[in-house]
């Protein structure tokens, strides 16, 4: 994924939860599924919007932790546990978990604002506004489709 690309989560997971000592899969919290699955209607609608507007995107797994990803070691760690991960961030799985608990449909999208490279802090500051604007534009088009 490159800066400016969009990831639509078909599912989300935590990549910093470790209850394996209690017999759980890595990433799974007690009483919760390992993956929180997005509403397929929402995923398909976003896929349509992104294709129509020629925005490079992928559909797939987004993982969440409580810390900013910077450095090769963290990237390797996440990939070892979730090899199919498309993006990592700090909020999505919590949103998905809340929607799951409330039995509400959801989807999470991410416009890539940085990579987990060594200079991620600098890249994030440079591109966070651009990524946010793109996410907002995509969301507005998505809402038009649902209307």
Listing of model-derived features with the role each one plays in the protein:
Residues 1-147:
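Glycine-rich phosphate- or other oxyanion-binding loops that anchor nucleotides, phosphorylated ligands
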């Amino acid at each position: 994924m490159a800066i400016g690309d969009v990831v639509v989560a078909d599912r989300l997971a935590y990549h910093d939860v470790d209850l394996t000592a209690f017999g759980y899969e890595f990433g799974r919290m007690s009483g919760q599924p390992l993956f929180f699955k997005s509403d397929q209607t929402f995923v398909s609608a976003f896929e349509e919007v992104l294709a129509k507007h020629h925005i490079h995107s992928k559909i797939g797994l987004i993982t969440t932790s409580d810390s900013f990803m910077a450095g090769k070691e963290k990237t390797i760690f996440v990939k070892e546990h979730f090899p199919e991960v498309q993006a990592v961030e700090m909020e999505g799985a919590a949103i998905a978990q809340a929607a799951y608990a409330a039995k509400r449909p959801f989807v999470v999208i991410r416009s890539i604002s940085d990579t987990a490279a060594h200079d991620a802090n600098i890249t994030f500051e440079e591109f966070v506004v651009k990524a946010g604007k793109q996410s907002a534009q995509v969301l507005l088009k998505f809402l038009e489709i649902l209307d």
